[in-house]
């Protein structure tokens, strides 16, 4: 996975008493509140970007447009952060779309550069799990049992593994 660089070497230093660790950007604050373990691991990365959430009505309209029912966790993520991206990861509601594979009803929810650029993150109908599609060989692997565990557990593990 591509490397990220914290914005400051002091990121591991404890904050002064009474100082807030909350980011100034409202979308990043929402990301921190929803996915605390993920944010603790990546909050200082220079290239971390988060976009403000969508309204519940906009999320419902996106589900209707894509003809795909989102999991409860994906809906919650989208109402807090419509996009999360950094080197090697991109999950953006505006880029969601059906996968072009015969006989598949999967939805592409993003890109995750674990092995190769352009590998995809997928969700399946009526399944809250997050899957990884390796473009090179077409292999599909379950990454996590849900969106929150994907960010808070799986991504954190991959970021800090050798």
List where the protein language model places each region.
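A surface-exposed partner-binding patch
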Residues: 2-132
């Amino acid at each position: 996975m591509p490397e990220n660089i914290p914005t400051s070497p002091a990121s591991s230093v404890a904050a002064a008493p009474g100082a807030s660790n909350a980011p100034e950007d409202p979308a990043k604050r929402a990301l921190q509140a929803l996915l605390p373990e993920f944010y603790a691991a990546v909050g200082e990365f220079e290239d971390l970007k988060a976009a403000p959430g969508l309204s519940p009505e906009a999320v419902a309209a996106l589900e209707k447009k894509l003809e795909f029912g989102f999991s409860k966790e994906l809906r919650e993520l989208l109402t807090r952060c419509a996009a999360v991206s950094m080197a090697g990861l991109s999950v953006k509601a505006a880029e969601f779309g059906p996968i072009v594979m015969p006989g598949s009803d999967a939805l592409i929810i993003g890109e995750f550069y674990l092995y190769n650029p352009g590998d995809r993150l997928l969700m399946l109908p009526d399944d809250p799990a997050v899957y990884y599609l390796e473009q090179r060989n077409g292999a599909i692997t379950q990454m996590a049992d849900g969106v929150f565990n994907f960010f808070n557990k799986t991504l954190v593990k991959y970021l800090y593994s050798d």
